[in-house]
């Protein structure tokens, strides 16, 4: 069901618009006694998820008991980073996703299905994994909040990825990323339907049905002055809400050029990009526009590590 949806290439949603849209949806969903919010981490600080999480906290008050940022294998946020992205929310509500030790396997997707969606290139089973708080926390509502934007692994970010990858375990994360790599980034970037998304949506249909997840999806673009603005807000619990957000993202987050780029300079926001693991997005998101033998210059003042984890690093 779609509880709320608005947006276009010219829409500019204010914080008041976000509040009205979110509260319209939450009113339709009905009263809840124990709510979990799953937003992104600070690597998605521009998603408006911080503000939306605060609005949800204001709406549910003491009934919002837990906030679990979808870290994936990213390094946990510091208290300062949490306060910056989620101002006005008590720090004691935040939980840290431990992708090594705090995941449960909901079920296994068989190797035949993986082989089918990957054109026979990969044949291994895939575990549908989530943080145990999602499965065993006893929440009567899980709000999955985040931005739909072109993504180098899943074609379009968010929706079922936020739960099954963002709160998943190492095996599920690594194997899903490898499927995207084998299929080919150029074939899936910006496409809502692709093998990785088929896997995540199929797993969700089999193993998330007993978990009351509602997705709150934003689409962010730039106005004529280059300022980031919110172009869309879509809230619901079916794939249709994701497709609406993806269609809008395709219009506002892609720039089609008349000819390839000979030389490009990419600046990485130091608050968002601190590792080469994330900084490599400067390559992923330009490579399809770069000319053969072109030059890409990456300015990364916040860079301090390779991996998003001390052991991986």
What are these regions (language model features)?
Residues 63-74, 295-301:
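Short internal beta-strands
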Residues 1-17:
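N-terminal amphipathic/basic leader segments beginning at the initiator methionine
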Residues 34-45, 68-72, 144, 265-267:
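Short glycine-rich or small-residue beta-strand-to-loop segments that form or flank ligand, phosphate
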Residues 81-101, 307-313:
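Acidic, Ser/Thr-rich peripheral helices and adjacent loops at domain boundaries
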Residues 274-313:
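C-terminal catalytic subdomain
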Residues 96, 100-260, 288:
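Conserved, well-structured core segments that form the ligand-binding/active-site neighborhood
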């Amino acid at each position: 069901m779609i509880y709320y949806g608005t947006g276009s290439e010219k829409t500019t949603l204010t914080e008041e618009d976000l509040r009205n849209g979110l509260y319209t949806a939450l009113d339709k969903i009905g009263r809840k006694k124990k709510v979990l919010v799953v937003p992104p981490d600070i690597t998605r600080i521009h998603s408006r998820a911080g503000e939306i999480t605060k609005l949800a906290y204001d709406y549910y008050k003491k009934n919002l008991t837990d906030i679990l940022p979808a870290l994936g294998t990213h390094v946990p946020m510091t208290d300062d980073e949490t306060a910056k992205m989620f101002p006005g929310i008590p720090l004691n509500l935040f939980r840290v996703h431990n992708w090594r030790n705090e995941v449960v396997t909901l079920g296994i997707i068989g190797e035949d299905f993986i082989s089918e969606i990957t054109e026979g290139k990969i044949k291994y089973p895939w575990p549908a994994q989530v943080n145990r708080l999602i499965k065993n926390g006893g929440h009567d509502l899980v709000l999955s909040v985040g931005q739909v934007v072109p993504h180098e692994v899943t074609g379009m970010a968010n929706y079922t990825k936020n739960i099954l990858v963002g709160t998943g375990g190492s095996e599920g994360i690594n194997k899903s990323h490898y499927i995207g790599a084998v299929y080919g980034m150029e074939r899936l970037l910006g496409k809502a339907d692709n093998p990785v998304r088929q896997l995540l949506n199929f797993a969700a249909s089999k193993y998330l049905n007993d978990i009351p997840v509602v997705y709150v999806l934003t689409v962010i673009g730039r106005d004529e002055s280059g300022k980031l603005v919110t172009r869309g807000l879509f809230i619901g619990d079916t794939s249709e809400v994701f497709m609406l957000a993806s269609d809008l993202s395709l219009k506002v987050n892609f720039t089609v050029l008349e000819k390839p780029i000979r030389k490009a300079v990419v600046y990485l926001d130091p608050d968002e990009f601190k590792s080469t693991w994330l900084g490599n997005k400067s390559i992923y998101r330009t490579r399809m526009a770069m000319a053969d033998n072109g030059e890409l210059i990456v300015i990364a003042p916040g860079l301090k590590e390779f991996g998003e984890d001390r052991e991986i690093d």
